[in-house]
């Protein structure tokens, strides 16, 4: 059976198709149950995130994976990618390391890969091949991230803003943070904030339901945007990224908030284009305003560093893919070797016991030894002899060449005359 990966991601499919192919909540255990009931798929791990859905499987053909995904999510032809064996291994190593992510080197994907592996194991979908692959994946990803700077320093304006806030305030766990908006940028900021500790998280948005959804994921308090003015003074740090065409935070709002705070400093990050916070806010004492342009300059240096580190990580992955495939091939060859040795040992034990009985019954030793040697020869050579005869009839030259390598001609050896009972040795 072959190792396959079939999937789509942010590079190959728009968000509406990724949503259709996503497996979250109750849909995930149903999907895993369906995979378990698919006889053509021997092992499977289903990785589903907001940016990708990928099915890693051991199966005879990719058609089984394609049919299963089509039944679950409809026609996705033209948006899917498919890799087999070594390229499937390489793809998984790159995904887990963050080299295939929307944000190069982002660390969250490794945890998501581990969750997918753990969930597949809990649903009885893991066998030896996928389990070994994923265990090796975790090791490779850890090494690539440790030995290179591929995950170092923020490369999005949201993560850079959070890092700057953490540096400005020695302890965010003693601070109140206000998020204005509920889109992708604010989601990313909330995710980075939740990795640390924040004393209090407020989330204001024009659509309250979206703020409530974000607050439930990150332990915050949702507010309607109409209450922004009333709560602004509570915030030590403000991140704003709405889709508004005009500023939502004005100079007078911040001046009022500072008075209510007795001019305790406020850190404000305007992550929106067009801007959410009036530029004049930056002229206020104790208000420290950073815009997208301010953050972008720092982020670009970090991105350049990650791209250079990514090349180093790719080299590590190339080496580890080769080693993993070599190990797998060696392991695959062990099974027939074990079978061959077991067959030889069983034959030896059986015929040796027969010889002992013949000696005990008084048969001459020379005759017993001759029968033992003849029996071993017949029994051990019968399977390859039968296979070679079949190969000759079918024109299988590969097997014939393999036999020539396994049983090279012995110089000076003359075949004995064939006895009638040697013509077709039986097991």
Swiss-Prot record:
One BP term from GO: protoporphyrinogen IX biosynthetic process from glutamate
Residues that bind NADP(+): 181-186
Pathway it works in: Porphyrin-containing compound metabolism; protoporphyrin-IX biosynthesis; 5-aminolevulinate from L-glutamyl-tRNA(Glu): step 1/2
Active site per UniProt: 50
Biased composition (Basic and acidic residues): 418-427
EC class name: oxidoreductase
Ranges in coiled-coil conformation: none
Keyword set, alphabetical order: NADP, Oxidoreductase, Porphyrin biosynthesis
Assembly information from the UniProt record: Homodimer.
Name the record gives this protein: Glutamyl-tRNA reductase
UniProt source species: Stenotrophomonas maltophilia (strain K279a)
Classification of source organism: Bacteria, Pseudomonadati, Pseudomonadota, Gammaproteobacteria, Lysobacterales
